[in-house]
Amino acid sequence: MEAKATAKYIRISPQKARLVVDLIRGKKVDDAREILNYSRKRSGQIVGKVLKSAFANAVQNPNIDEKILFVKEIFVDQGPSMKRWRARAQGRAASIKKRMSHITVILDEK
């Protein structure tokens, strides 16, 4: 039985979020939480919240044993980008893309 949680429009670059997501793919939920707690990356906190939400969704189902849950799938998709402008020399402007992410976590029993 699967449990799923998704966080959309998170203001962090997908490239930076994937660095943390790759660390916990396939791990047990307890091990994944420990890894995220000691991660110094900002995306570690965000991914931790999504993992906690997926775990809470799994606990709602009485047929699921929470002790044997593991991260079956976790991925980061690119969301929309906010376009901003930064002033540059001699009256020019440079565009800046502030990227967003959609983070999805799927837990399952081993």
Swiss-Prot record:
Keywords attached to this entry: Ribonucleoprotein, Ribosomal protein, RNA-binding, rRNA-binding
Organism: Syntrophus aciditrophicus (strain SB)
Pfam families, alphabetized: Ribosomal_L22
Function noted in UniProt: This protein binds specifically to 23S rRNA; its binding is stimulated by other ribosomal proteins, e.g. L4, L17, and L20. It is important during the early stages of 50S assembly. It makes multiple contacts with different domains of the 23S rRNA in the assembled 50S subunit and ribosome. The globular domain of the protein is located near the polypeptide exit tunnel on the outside of the subunit, while an extended beta-hairpin is found that lines the wall of the exit tunnel in the center of the 70S ribosome.
Assembly: Part of the 50S ribosomal subunit.
Keyword set includes Translocase: no
Protein name per the record: Large ribosomal subunit protein uL22
Family indicated by similarity: Belongs to the universal ribosomal protein uL22 family.
Listed HAMAP family: Ribosomal_uL22_B (MF_01331_B)
GO MF annotation terms: rRNA binding; structural constituent of ribosome
Entry keyword annotation includes rRNA-binding: yes
Cellular component aspect of the GO annotation: cytosolic large ribosomal subunit
InterPro entries assigned to the protein according to its UniProt record, in alphabetical order: Ribosomal_uL22, Ribosomal_uL22_bac/chlpt-type, Ribosomal_uL22_bac/org-type, Ribosomal_uL22_CS, Ribosomal_uL22_sf
Listed GO biological process terms: translation
CDD domains: Ribosomal_L22 (cd00336)
SUPFAM superfamilies per UniProt: Ribosomal protein L22
